[in-house]
Amino acid sequence: MQEFEIIIVGAGPAGLSAGIYVARQNVSCLVISKDLGGQMNLIPRLENYPGAIMSSGPILAKTLETQYLSFKGEIVYDTVEKIDETEGGFKIKTTRSEYKAKAIVLAPGKVPNMLGLENESQYFNKGIHYCTKC
C-alpha cells in the first residue's frame, strides 16, 4: 500500500490547484480522480479565466495537470470507493488499489443537473448549457 503525506480527491481546478501548492513544497502528494478536468471538460471556449486567452476547459485541465506533474506530484485515474480514518491519517480505497495518507483534500467537483428533457444531450452547448456564464 503506497503512502503519501497528502492525497487529493478530484482533478478539477480545485484539486489540481491544491496539488500544485502541495507538490511545490516537496511534500509527497497523490491526486486521485476518475478523469482529468471534471466539469471543465464541458467548456468549449474559455475566455473569462485569468491568464488563459482563447482556451478551452480541456486545454486548461491539461495545462494544470502538466504544471502539477512538473513538481513531481503523482496522479492516478481511478474511482475512490471509500475513505476510512485511521490512527495518524486516512486509508483510501479505490477500484484498483489502496493508499494511506496523513491528510486528505476533498475536491470531487460536481455533476451538472440534467433537466430530463427529450433530446437534451443533443442540444448540449447548442442552446442548453450547464455553466452560469455561457
Residue spans for each PLM region:
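Conserved acidic E/D residue at the C-terminus of a beta-strand in Rossmann-like folds
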Residues: V31-D35, P44
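A generic structural signal for alpha->beta connector loops
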Residues: N26-S28, K72, N125
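Short N-terminal binding/cap micro-motifs at the start of the first secondary-structure element
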Residues: L16, G37-Q39
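N-terminal Rossmann-like dinucleotide/flavin-binding domain of flavoprotein oxidoreductases
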Residues: N41-E98
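N-terminal Rossmann-like FAD-binding beta1-loop-alpha1 element of flavoenzymes
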Residues: E3-L30
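Glycine-rich, phosphate-binding/catalytic loops in enzymes
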Residues: Q25, N48, E120-F124
